[in-house]
A protein has these predicted regions:
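Hydrolase active-site cap/lid region
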Residues: 216-265, 322-325, 331-338
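Cap/lid segment of the alpha/beta-hydrolase catalytic domain
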Residues: 102-107, 118, 126-180, 234-247
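Short beta-strand/loop motif that positions the catalytic acidic residue
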Residues: 288, 294-296
Length: 473
């Protein structure tokens, strides 16, 4: 039932640097799998609440996934999560959806599942679960007065890894193990409350740093059948962030937590390459051949809309892409959830996904060749007359749509007029019908014309305190 590999234009120069130094880091390649699958005696779960609904039942479970570090390193080692489960009265599938979510450990117990997850469970006849508090936060590390959240927490743990080489430190290790624990708990719990019904596998999704976690759990756990990572448009991190600087001439304020921790100064260093061996999805791509739908935002505060050029073509197996126009990083006020539902339903029902290829042509157009004809093809475009910057924060929600007619059956060519000043970004969106009357929207990558980058990237002087370089001096 799986479609043929979905391909795009090939972009030159998108590989992370390799060589003898990179090969010496091979010992880190299995660290993630070893960490995630190591048995942790802290693992346990407890049903806290059962809520009956019309055609479904909700369960609020307190899950302890692991111990992270020791009390000599951090003020709280046990990672506690709320695992909120929706079970339809009639379960039609052995596949469940796991949404990896955030939140604070200061939050009260959930009153139940979110409406959107109830809707997905009832519509598809499948179990849907939201795993909250990934990462556990806030955490206060030894020697610090302030508690850290989100990117500040992650950046701090990266810095610790760069200086020590200790694979226990990167918070993404524990974040990934959290999802493994959630899947374990679901496979144990569902047969108890559903007359022996079993779960065989999972579709995993999550946004931003939880989108990164979506990639990493798929790389190390074969129970993951497909993934839908949201707004984590930064695989192949080194060339991606060099591109970031060359487009903007500065680091976007959204990544200030990493700048403040001096993470950007490590870019390209042996220590950073070691971290990538551990937790960067791009380095694990040989294990990521499963179906994948990557949903990104054209106006993301963190990532450029042209970032997929550094990874998408090199991903293996079935792959689809959607850039949501006029969207910030949070994907609010968009139909991204409909695309997620349509894709998830296609996985559950073993329906082939649409196949198409695109290329960026020498005349400045995007050429799209479809195996299955879409209901409609649309060109979305936006202009910034002063900067190569398409964040909503910079240009507002200014992307506009225009229907494009086929050149021949299933073939579309998207031409745009160059702006008198500045840069124009554009993409082609293809809309397909589905059996559940929810459209599946997929896109090409984003093209920017003229293809110029106004700023030079100057490589930083790497810190001397790295666990590799300090031994070489």
């Amino acid at each position: 039932m799986l479609l043929l590999a979905f391909t795009s234009v090939t972009f030159a120069g998108s590989e992370t640097p390799t060589g003898a130094a990179d090969q010496s880091l091979s010992r880190f390649e299995t660290a993630l799998a070893e960490y995630v699958h190591k048995k942790d005696p802290a693992y346990r779960y407890d049903l806290r609440q059962t809520i009956s609904g019309n055609g479904f039942t909700e369960y609020v479970i307190e899950l302890v996934s692991q111990n992270f570090l020791t009390l000599a390193d951090v003020d709280r080692t046990e990672w506690h999560h709320w695992l909120v489960v929706v079970k339809p009265d009639v379960i039609r599938h052995k596949t469940a959806l796991v949404y990896v979510g955030g939140g604070s450990n200061r939050d009260d117990s959930p009153r139940g599942a979110r409406d959107e997850f109830v809707s997905i469970a009832v519509t598809t006849g499948s179990v849907v679960a939201e795993l909250r508090m990934v990462p556990n936060q806030p955490l206060r590390f030894a020697g610090e007065n302030e508690r850290r959240f989100e990117d500040s927490l992650i950046a701090y743990t990266w810095d610790k890894f760069y200086r020590t080489g200790d694979v226990r430190w990167p918070a993404r290790m524990a974040m990934t193990k959290s999802v493994k624990a959630a899947m374990d708990a679901l496979q144990e719990f569902i047969p108890v409350v559903s007359s022996g019904h079993t779960l065989a596998d999972f579709v995993v999704t999550g946004a931003s740093k939880r989108g990164w976690t979506t990639w990493t759990i798929a790389a190390v756990d074969q129970r993951v059948r497909a993934i839908i990572p949201l707004v984590i448009d930064m695989l192949n991190l080194v060339p991606s962030f060099k591109h970031h600087w060359r487009a903007y001439g500065f680091w976007a304020p959204a990544i200030d937590d990493y700048v403040d921790q001096n993470i950007m100064a490590w870019m390209g260093s042996p220590e950073e390459l070691a971290l990538h061996k551990v937790v960067e999805p791009y380095t694990h791509r040989q294990h990521l051949t499963l179906p994948k739908l990557i949903i990104n935002a054209t106006g993301d505060e963190f990532f450029l809309p042209t970032s997929s050029q550094f990874y998408f073509d090199k991903l293996l197996g079935e792959k689809h892409l959607r850039y949501v126009p006029n969207s910030r990083h949070n994907l609010s006020r968009t139909d991204a959830l409909q695309t997620l539902l349509a894709y998830y339903h296609s996985v559950l029902s073993d329906r082939p996904r649409p196949r198409f290829e695109w290329s960026f042509e020498a005349d400045g157009s995007i050429l799209v060749e479809c195996h299955e004809t879409p209901v409609v093809a649309t060109i979305w475009s936006a202009v910034n007359p002063t900067n190569r910057d398409f964040r909503v924060d910079s240009i507002g929600r200014s992307w506009t749509a225009e229907v494009v007619e086929p050149v021949t059956e299933g073939v579309y060519r998207a031409h745009v007029t160059l702006p008198e000043k500045g840069w124009k970004a554009f993409l082609v969106e293809l809309t397909y019908s589905t059996p559940i009357d929810v459209p599946m929207k997929l896109t090409t990558a984003v093209r920017v014309l003229p293809n110029t980058l106004p700023h030079d990237y100057i490589a930083p002087k790497w810190p001397d305190e790295g666990f590799i370089r300090s031994k070489q001096q």
